[in-house]
Amino acid sequence: VLFRSCWVALTYNKKNIRKYMEPNENLVIVIAFGIPANWGYNHKSKLPRQVSNVSDNSPQWFKDGVDCALNAPTAINQQKFMLTLVDDKVKAKAKFAPSAKVDLGIVKYHFEVGSGKDHSIWI
């Protein structure tokens, strides 16, 4: 069975969800999982060079990490992040966007999965 997921940060009614939360819980995003009624469409994705300093001479793990990061869901599918290879480490920066810090965390996780590196890769 194939499932789809979607996360939403700005376009939902928080009052309807708060009734299911404890008073000390903080709501950041909502994630929906399920089998879609229709499969929607693919969103346009940026090129690796638009979100990183990747080049022909970059190590394969960095190229693979950037490719995987481009598949990370971001707010309004804007992909407003920059991954910069500095020596053997990576600097990740969020550009101004709604939910930029949430986006960057998801992007960094996708990069780690694609590159085969762990959290120690980050500057």
Question: Positions of the model-derived regions?
Answer:
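Acidic, surface-exposed loops and disordered segments
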Residues: 1-123
